Regions:
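Histidine-acidic metal/acid-base catalytic patches
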Residues: 12, 26, 102-109, 115-242
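Active-site acidic/histidine proton-transfer and metal-coordination neighborhood
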Residues: 1-106
Length: 242
């Protein structure tokens, strides 16, 4: 249901097609989310698999689909706040990179996802961007062994004032797959808001990482709203008032 294929082989074919398409388009990098969660887990606030189990399964999947194929792009693994590679534990991140055989690899650090993961793990209670930047810098410092592999940043913020107990409360799942998907998507996006930054606090994170790529990954309903959100974020990062 999730990936419109009948089995694992069909899913692997989809990934290979995506990789081939990225190569044909001349992409400099491709992004893979190292995570696994179902609608039922999101709504019930539980996890069927540990971070390490998902990391090992992801690495095994990537090794199978990439083996024997040569691509010019860098493959970046992105952190999320559901089970998988969250960046909360540096040893798990190091394990992910060590298990993947594809040499041209790295990390895409998503600031909003990391804020959400820190909040869910009780490691970020501040409701200001300054406190969020401090918490992310602590994560970067803990990743000193693999910091050079953090090649990109998805720049945005999660909801810093949404009560965590509101996010984690159990919701009765709807009967149909489509309705359950809508329920879980609404829950996730309430926390993972992809909102523009309003201060220049995250410049310290950018300076500490010195990434090759920066993406202003902001939610919007229309292209005009997207452009305005990017403008606001750029203005904030320059130290100006929005």
């Amino acid at each position: 249901e999730y990936y419109c294929c009948a089995d694992a082989a069909g899913f692997e074919r989809q990934i290979i097609e995506d990789m081939d398409r990225a190569e044909a388009l001349g992409a400099k990098y491709a992004v893979f989310h190292c995570a696994d969660i179902s609608n039922e887990e999101v709504l019930g606030n539980y996890a069927l698999h540990t971070n390490e189990e998902i990391i090992r399964a992801t690495a095994s999947l990537i090794n199978r689909v990439m083996r024997g194929r040569k691509y010019s792009f860098t493959l970046l693994f992105e952190n999320l706040f559901v089970p998988g590679m969250t960046l909360i534990n540096s040893a798990e991140t190091e394990l992910m990179l060590s298990l993947v055989e594809y040499e041209n690899k790295g990390i895409m650090l998503d600031t909003g996802h990391l804020m959400a993961a820190l909040r869910l793990n009780g490691l970020l209670t501040a409701q200001k961007e300054e406190g969020a930047a401090d918490a992310i810098l602590n994560v970067v410092a803990a990743h000193w062994r693999v910091k050079k592999h953090i090649l990109g940043i998805h720049l945005h913020k999660c909801s810093l004032n949404m009560p965590i107990e509101e996010y984690t409360k159990v919701i009765a799942p709807a009967e149909s797959f489509e309705e359950r998907s809508a329920q879980s998507y609404a829950r996730i996006m309430a926390l993972d808001a992809h909102s523009p930054l309003e201060t220049d606090a995250m410049r310290r994170v950018i300076d500490a990482i010195a990434p090759r790529y920066i993406v202003h990954e902001l939610s919007a309903r229309t292209p005009a709203e997207k452009a305005e959100a990017v403008r606001m974020q750029l203005k904030s990062l320059r130290g100006c008032c929005p």
